[in-house]
């Protein structure tokens, strides 16, 4: 086999290594939560990875960034800041919970299994079994976004409460003046002197 033929077969060989790893861990491709709330991602794996460490990290998931949260040994539950990983070997799943979400938590994450090569410090030679999750964070919960019915405006001419307001005090004299004038006019009209018509002699 020539050197050129070997170089041409190298990408195919790497693809064969990657495809099995990409299919051994599964879960949702997209999850959504609201700011201040929590969301959970359930990751399912094959039985052969039952005793392996499980991890959660943000893409591109570089170890030097120290943003990876990983179970270790017999620990079934690991917590780091707002991330909790709970392994359930009985049903071959592990759950990742993100608490107190912020807008900055939105992005792409990796839900994966730590291989032996990675545990031995040989990270990067073989791809870990994992799948990618898109985390979406909404600005507010649906309850906060609900439309509130505006209060009915009060009429300025109405007097509410047991004690009249200052507005009512101002309106009452204005209403009494025309009423008094009407009554006074009626009294004067009734009591006016009647003229006796002149009789012709």
From Swiss-Prot:
<dbReference type="InterPro" id="IPR036179">
    <property type="entry name" value="Ig-like_dom_sf"/>
</dbReference>
<keyword id="KW-0325">Glycoprotein</keyword>
<keyword id="KW-0393">Immunoglobulin domain</keyword>
<feature type="disulfide bond">
    <location>
        <begin position="43"/>
        <end position="111"/>
    </location>
</feature>
<dbReference type="GO" id="GO:0005576">
    <property type="term" value="C:extracellular region"/>
</dbReference>
<comment type="similarity">
    <text>Belongs to the CD300 family.</text>
</comment>
<dbReference type="InterPro" id="IPR007110">
    <property type="entry name" value="Ig-like_dom"/>
</dbReference>
<protein>
    <recommendedName>
        <fullName>Protein CD300H</fullName>
    </recommendedName>
</protein>
<dbReference type="InterPro" id="IPR050671">
    <property type="entry name" value="CD300_family_receptors"/>
</dbReference>
<dbReference type="Pfam" id="PF07686">
    <property type="entry name" value="V-set"/>
</dbReference>
<comment type="subunit">
    <text>Interacts with TYROBP and HCST.</text>
</comment>
<dbReference type="InterPro" id="IPR003599">
    <property type="entry name" value="Ig_sub"/>
</dbReference>
<feature type="glycosylation site" description="N-linked (GlcNAc...) asparagine">
    <location>
        <position position="100"/>
    </location>
</feature>
<comment type="function">
    <text>May play an important role in innate immunity by mediating a signal for the production of a neutrophil chemoattractant.</text>
</comment>
<feature type="transmembrane region" description="Helical">
    <location>
        <begin position="169"/>
        <end position="189"/>
    </location>
</feature>
<keyword id="KW-0964">Secreted</keyword>
<keyword id="KW-0472">Membrane</keyword>
<dbReference type="GO" id="GO:0045088">
    <property type="term" value="P:regulation of innate immune response"/>
</dbReference>
<dbReference type="GO" id="GO:0005886">
    <property type="term" value="C:plasma membrane"/>
</dbReference>
<feature type="signal peptide">
    <location>
        <begin position="1"/>
        <end position="24"/>
    </location>
</feature>
<dbReference type="InterPro" id="IPR013106">
    <property type="entry name" value="Ig_V-set"/>
</dbReference>
<keyword id="KW-0732">Signal</keyword>
<keyword id="KW-1015">Disulfide bond</keyword>
<dbReference type="GO" id="GO:0004888">
    <property type="term" value="F:transmembrane signaling receptor activity"/>
</dbReference>
<dbReference type="InterPro" id="IPR013783">
    <property type="entry name" value="Ig-like_fold"/>
</dbReference>
<feature type="domain" description="Ig-like V-type">
    <location>
        <begin position="25"/>
        <end position="123"/>
    </location>
</feature>
<dbReference type="GO" id="GO:0007165">
    <property type="term" value="P:signal transduction"/>
</dbReference>
<feature type="topological domain" description="Cytoplasmic">
    <location>
        <begin position="190"/>
        <end position="201"/>
    </location>
</feature>
<feature type="topological domain" description="Extracellular">
    <location>
        <begin position="25"/>
        <end position="168"/>
    </location>
</feature>
<keyword id="KW-1133">Transmembrane helix</keyword>
<keyword id="KW-0812">Transmembrane</keyword>
<dbReference type="GO" id="GO:0030593">
    <property type="term" value="P:neutrophil chemotaxis"/>
</dbReference>
């Amino acid at each position: 086999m020539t050197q050129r033929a070997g170089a041409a077969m190298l990408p195919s060989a790497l693809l064969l290594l990657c495809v099995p790893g990409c299919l051994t861990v599964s879960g949702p491709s997209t999850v959504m939560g609201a700011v201040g709330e929590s969301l959970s991602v359930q990751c399912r794996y094959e039985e052969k990875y039952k005793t392996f460490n499980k991890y959660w990290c943000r893409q591109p998931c570089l170890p030097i960034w120290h943003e990876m949260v990983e179970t270790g040994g017999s620990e079934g539950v690991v917590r780091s800041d707002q991330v909790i990983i709970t392994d359930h070997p009985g049903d071959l799943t592990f759950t990742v919970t993100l608490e107190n979400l912020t807008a900055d938590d939105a992005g792409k994450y990796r839900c994966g299994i730590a291989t032996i090569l990675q545990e031995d410090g040989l990270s990067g030679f073989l791809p870990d079994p994992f799948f990618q999750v898109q985390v979406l964070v909404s600005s507010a919960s649906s309850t906060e976004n609900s439309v509130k019915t505006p209060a009915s405006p009060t009429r300025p001419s109405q007097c509410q409460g047991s004690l009249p307001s200052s507005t009512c005090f101002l309106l009452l004299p204005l209403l009494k003046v025309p009423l008094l004038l009407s009554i006074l006019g009626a009294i004067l009209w009734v009591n006016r002197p009647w003229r006796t018509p002149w009789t012709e002699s």
